[in-house]
Amino acid sequence: MESPLGSDLARLVRVWRALIDHRLKPLELTQTHWVTLHNIHQLPPEQSQIQLAKAIGIEQPSLVRTLDQLEEKGLISRQTCSSDRRAKRIKLTEKAEPLINEMEEVIGKTRDEILSGVSKQEVETLLHLIRKLEQNILDLQAKD
């Protein structure tokens, strides 16, 4: 019987995320917070919520709850866009910058520990396969 690849990948993501959540707990953040802050930090300044949701790969309503939490923590600010009152622009606060550096350290160290014993070539092969599978899925979705 073949391995249930989808289940295996889902389980890997779950345990990886749980470890990240555990390691970010002292910073009072979660993996979801990190992904959101990381993307805000990487994107050009004052992106809209729509652009951020696309960059992360989630629906905008799913993003709003996380943004509410980050705003409550004083890590981001949201302002109504002057050209489109329905759109909100997102900006990191000064309080977020040092925290992002701490988070990146935690994530980097955790990633290195997870990948210990895995060669650079194995990681490159895995990334290649993931991209290939993702493209196959996107192609199938486009056909449906």
From Swiss-Prot:
Residues 49-72 bind DNA. GO terms for biological process: response to stress. Pfam families: MarR. InterPro entries: HTH_MarR-typ, MarR/SlyA-like, Tscrpt_reg_MarR-type_CS, Tscrpt_reg_SlyA, WH-like_DNA-bd_sf, WH_DNA-bd_sf. Residues 2-135 form the HTH marR-type domain. GO terms for molecular function: DNA binding; DNA-binding transcription factor activity. Keywords: Activator, DNA-binding, Repressor, Transcription, Transcription regulation. Transcription regulator that can specifically activate or repress expression of target genes. Homodimer. Belongs to the SlyA family. This is Transcriptional regulator SlyA. It comes from Klebsiella pneumoniae (strain 342). The lineage of its organism: Bacteria, Pseudomonadati, Pseudomonadota, Gammaproteobacteria, Enterobacterales.
